[in-house]
Amino acid sequence: MQAFTTLDGLVVPLDRANVDTDAIIPKQFLKSIKRAGFGPNLFDEWRYLDHGEPGMDPATRQPNPAFVLNLPRYAGASVLLARDNFGCGSSREHAPWALEDYGIRAIIAPSFADIFYNNCFKNGILPIVLDAAAVDRLFGECEASAGYRLKIDLEQQTVTTPGGEVLRFEVDAGRKHRLLNGLDDIGLTLLQADKIKAYEARRRQEAPWLFA
């Protein structure tokens, strides 16, 4: 998993509350368990005017010119600005996979659905909770200024605006450690590899019939 330390990223504003995981990545794209390849179908039903199915070439589809991800000024954005209860709905881990595959490294919102919030940390995305008033200000600044960027420092737990405003956010120490060091669940387990090997060796001595 890619580590997250600091980010100076272009912001894309998604001004909708209660964005659920089916909107983030529709159910017909959930057949694959590979983490890569979901980016072209992120927000598929909003992003395109035609109905998407697995295997369709995005280059041949009809984009929705009004959807924010299709506006040239937001091309290459790595910070998603969202509203309340982002990531609600089913617990599909494909949702953060699609966001990460598109290039989103951080999401800022007043609140997140719990399971989605947890899944972000497991997939290299930093979900940042800021109060609604601060998020409102960021939306206003972003929509008023092309090329709007935010600087995010996970170690210091800060978001800095182009005008110099510093917004502080909270993050669990364990989750922070995971992101700073690029550790997913497998990576965390491998940190204990020596202890696991020692335990298995001891169990072979204590209960050899289990390994027969």
From Swiss-Prot:
Transmembrane segment boundaries: none
Keyword tags: Amino-acid biosynthesis, Branched-chain amino acid biosynthesis, Leucine biosynthesis, Lyase
Top EC class for this record: lyase
Any one GO cellular component localisation term in the record: 3-isopropylmalate dehydratase complex
Record's keyword annotation contains Membrane: no
E.C. code: 4.2.1.33
Single GO biological process annotation from the record: L-leucine biosynthetic process
Family annotation (Pfam families): Aconitase_C
Pathway: Amino-acid biosynthesis; L-leucine biosynthesis; L-leucine from 3-methyl-2-oxobutanoate: step 2/4
Catalytic activity entry: (2R,3S)-3-isopropylmalate = (2S)-2-isopropylmalate
GO MF annotations, alphabetized: 3-isopropylmalate dehydratase activity
InterPro entries per the UniProt record, alphabetical: 3-IsopropMal_deHydase_ssu (IPR004431), Aconitase/3IPM_dehydase_swvl (IPR015928), AconitaseA/IPMdHydase_ssu_swvl (IPR000573), IPMI_Swivel (IPR033940), LeuD (IPR050075)
Family of the protein in this entry: Belongs to the LeuD family. LeuD type 1 subfamily.
Its biological purpose: Catalyzes the isomerization between 2-isopropylmalate and 3-isopropylmalate, via the formation of 2-isopropylmaleate.
Quaternary structure annotation from Swiss-Prot or TrEMBL: Heterodimer of LeuC and LeuD.
Protein name (Swiss-Prot/TrEMBL): 3-isopropylmalate dehydratase small subunit
Organism of provenance: Thiobacillus denitrificans (strain ATCC 25259 / T1)
